[in-house]
Amino acid sequence: MANDKNEDQKEEETKTLQEKYDELLEELDSKNKELAKINEDLEKQKEETQEYISLSQRLQADFENFKKINEKKSKDIIKFANEPLIKNILDSYEDLERALENSKTEKELRDGVELIYSKIKDVLTKEGLEEIPAKGEKFDPFKHEALMVANDENVENGYIIDELMKGYTLKGKVIKYSKVRVCKK
């Protein structure tokens, strides 16, 4: 009986061990499946990461190309910004050349030069150039440059007596100050 009991006990222990072994195998199988899923997800993440890196590199390259193209366009815009003005002045330049070549008398030359002066003035006015009024105006240091001062009984203190050189604005911005003589008493 003791043997039967021992055998029953051994059988029971074996059965319990077998059950634990089976449970552990199931748990191991489950963990292996989880690990396989994690590895699969990790591979997908690696692929996505690589795609993002590749996309980022392409975008960076595209952006660099975009910057280079815009830089070239900007340089071209600056380089050729005066083209319309030059084209307009070229007509007057050629007129001046013809006037010099074809004028027989001083009057013809003067008439030709006056016509050319008028054309150039029109071109510059269309481009936004305006003369700064000076003579008889109150001195304005933002528009005028006083080269001389003088006392003139006919002119109020601080007003311009003479304009020595004309000044100009381009679309409202002073590009050349009028050189003037100012009355100072």
Curated annotation (Swiss-Prot):
CC annotations in GO? cytoplasm
UniProt keyword list: Chaperone, Cytoplasm, Stress response
Q: List the Pfam families.
A: GrpE
Q: Which CDD domains match?
A: GrpE (cd00446)
What family is it from? Answer: Belongs to the GrpE family.
Keyword Calcium in annotation: no
The record, for PROSITE patterns, names: GRPE (PS01071)
HAMAP family per the record? GrpE
Under the heading SUPFAM superfamilies, the entry gives: Coiled-coil domain of nucleotide exchange factor GrpE (SSF58014), Head domain of nucleotide exchange factor GrpE (SSF51064)
Protein's name according to its UniProt entry: Protein GrpE
Major subcellular location class: cytoplasm
UniProt cross-references to InterPro entries, sorted A to Z: GrpE (IPR000740), GrpE_coiled_coil (IPR013805), GrpE_head (IPR009012)
Keyword Chaperone on this protein? yes
Question: What is its biological role?
Answer: Participates actively in the response to hyperosmotic and heat shock by preventing the aggregation of stress-denatured proteins, in association with DnaK and GrpE. It is the nucleotide exchange factor for DnaK and may function as a thermosensor. Unfolded proteins bind initially to DnaJ; upon interaction with the DnaJ-bound protein, DnaK hydrolyzes its bound ATP, resulting in the formation of a stable complex. GrpE releases ADP from DnaK; ATP binding to DnaK triggers the release of the substrate protein, thus completing the reaction cycle.
Compartments in which it is found: Cytoplasm
Any Gene Ontology biological process: protein folding
| Quaternary structure annotation from Swiss-Prot or TrEMBL | Homodimer.
Q: Which organism is it from?
A: Methanobrevibacter smithii (strain ATCC 35061 / DSM 861 / OCM 144 / PS)
- Show the GO MF annotations: adenyl-nucleotide exchange factor activity; protein homodimerization activity; protein-folding chaperone binding; unfolded protein binding
